[in-house]
């Protein structure tokens, strides 16, 4: 809040939500309270908050390993408070024989003021970044995102 008063606050990044603590009776309530407080803080200081969250192990147990909103760990409140929820999915993590090596899906499952969908990007893991796929890349999509559509990332 001190930075916001000085006009020096453009973005708040939390890596990751479950590392934060407040006094509460249960971990579920604690994460819910943290999520609500971050939402209020973002509105108060007029700065966007990007909060990374751990996922539960449920997606590891499914055939389709793509994460969804119910996989957010320890609280459904995160889903309620978030304006945008985006997951990163890399098929090569689960299938070393995939033809989609070096690619990632950015899956937007909630976008309060926009469209949900999936963006396919190339990965440059050695530089910790994504980039647009070049024309010579082919992405074999095995299952489209329900309710959304694929988009080109600009």
Predicted regions and their residues:
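Helical hairpin unit composed of two closely spaced alpha helices linked by a short loop
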Residues: 9-51
């Amino acid at each position: 809040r001190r930075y916001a008063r000085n006009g020096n606050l453009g973005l708040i990044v939390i890596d990751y939500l479950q590392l934060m603590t407040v006094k509460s009776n249960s971990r579920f309530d604690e994460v819910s309270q943290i999520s609500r407080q971050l939402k209020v803080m973002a509105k108060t200081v007029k700065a966007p908050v990007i909060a990374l969250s751990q996922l539960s192990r449920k997606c590891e147990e499914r055939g389709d390993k793509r994460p969804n909103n119910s996989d957010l760990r320890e609280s459904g409140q995160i889903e309620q408070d978030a304006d945008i929820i985006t997951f990163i999915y890399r098929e090569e993590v689960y299938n070393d024989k995939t033809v989609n090596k070096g690619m990632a899906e950015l899956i937007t499952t909630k976008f309060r003021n926009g469209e949900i969908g999936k963006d396919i990007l190339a990965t440059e893991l050695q530089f910790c970044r994504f980039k647009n796929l070049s024309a010579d890349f082919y992405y074999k999509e095995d299952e489209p995102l329900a309710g959304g559509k694929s988009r080109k990332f600009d």
